Amino acid sequence: SVVKSEDFSLPAYMDRRDYPLPEVAHVKHLSASQKALKEKEKASWSSLSMDEKVELYRIKFKESFAEMNRGSNEWKTVVGGAMFFIGFTALVIMWQKHYVYGPLPQSFDKEWVAKQTKRMLDMKVNPIQGLASKWDYEKNEWKK
């Protein structure tokens, strides 16, 4: 069996909104009824029925503009895939927090932070523009 490949040097049919008139017709090899319809097309178009006009259109074009502009449901697959990976990542992070990471160091405790801040104020750290400049040492409270 010999497989015949398509000749890509010839124009190919493609439905595109930005290029509405393709160089070749959609149907390349016409059947006997389609050939008869093409002969009938050469006469007056008023003698053609609506079904015949649609059939002639379908010989030339695969889709109408309304069919090309119709939305697809591909976005649902993309959103579903993204949500799957986000959920999987959340599960991995929860597993890591439970089994891999240890408890937080004591320096993250609110009491520790308060003691450290008080120590920095007592040492008058950065008295010009920093933390100590915003503390009122006479009233023992933050400046307003």
Swiss-Prot record:
Residues 1-73 are mitochondrial matrix. InterPro entries: Cyt_c_oxidase_su4, Cyt_c_oxidase_su4_fam, Cyt_c_oxidase_su4_sf. The gene is COX4I1. Keywords: Acetylation, Membrane, Mitochondrion, Mitochondrion inner membrane, Phosphoprotein, Transmembrane, Transmembrane helix. Belongs to the cytochrome c oxidase IV family. Pfam families: COX4 (PF02936). The modification Phosphoserine is found at residues 31, 33. Component of the cytochrome c oxidase (complex IV, CIV), a multisubunit enzyme composed of 14 subunits. The complex is composed of a catalytic core of 3 subunits MT-CO1, MT-CO2 and MT-CO3, encoded in the mitochondrial DNA, and 11 supernumerary subunits COX4I, COX5A, COX5B, COX6A, COX6B, COX6C, COX7A, COX7B, COX7C, COX8 and NDUFA4, which are encoded in the nuclear genome. This is Cytochrome c oxidase subunit 4 isoform 1, mitochondrial. Pathway: Energy metabolism; oxidative phosphorylation. The chain crosses the membrane at residues 74-99. The modification N6-acetyllysine is found at residues 4, 28, 35, 42. GO terms for biological process: mitochondrial electron transport, cytochrome c to oxygen. Residues 100-144 are mitochondrial intermembrane. The modification N6-succinyllysine is found at residues 4, 35. It comes from Gorilla gorilla gorilla (Western lowland gorilla).
